[in-house]
Swiss-Prot record:
Residues 1-49 are annotated as: Disordered. The keyword Lipid metabolism does not apply. One of its GO terms (cellular component) is cytosolic large ribosomal subunit. It comes from Shewanella denitrificans (strain OS217 / ATCC BAA-1090 / DSM 15013). It comes from the Bacteria. Binds to the 23S rRNA. This is Large ribosomal subunit protein uL15. SUPFAM superfamilies: Ribosomal proteins L15p and L18e. Residues 21-31 have a biased composition (Gly residues).
Length: 144
């Protein structure tokens, strides 16, 4: 048996509907679309959320919130990713050099996910309570 010789069991798959192929098929001429109207045309149909000209729900409801610009340049760093960084001092630039963070990131926060075995010094980064405890338990320290 080879992958290129596999085929489904006989009768398990039905043939696709072939529309517009003559009267005898039952789907000739208008091909199941009916007569005239927007939905019978090529490319016909309305966009998602269109309500026939009535003011759509999306516009009837009030706007709310905004996208924080700071959130776009902030990232979370897991404890296990700190192992990729060479050296004992970890700051924003060393994380970027180790390809843990992309170049556009300006703020980072270390979160407790995974473990860290070696002692490291974290400078100028935010750290969660759990991550702080794990870093200090490994013999490291956090400098603001």
């Amino acid at each position: 048996m080879r992958l290129n010789t596999l085929s489904p069991a006989a009768g398990s798959k039905s043939a696709p509907k072939r529309v517009g192929r003559g009267i005898g098929s039952g789907l000739g001429k208008t091909a199941g679309r009916g007569h005239k109207g927007q939905k019978s045309r090529s490319g016909g149909g309305v966009r998602v959320g269109f309500e026939g000209g009535q003011m759509p729900l999306k516009i009837r409801l009030p706007k709310f919130g905004f996208t924080s610009r700071r959130a776009l340049v902030t990232a979370e760093v897991r404890l296990l990713e700190l192992a990729k960084v060479n050296g004992d001092v970890i700051d924003l630039n060393t994380l970027k050099d180790a390809n843990v963070l992309t170049r556009n990131i300006q703020f980072a926060k270390i979160v407790l996910s995974g473990t860290i075995e070696r002692p490291v010094t974290v400078k100028g980064l935010k750290v969660t309570k759990g991550a702080r405890a794990a870093i200090e338990a490994a013999g490291g320290k956090i400098e603001e």
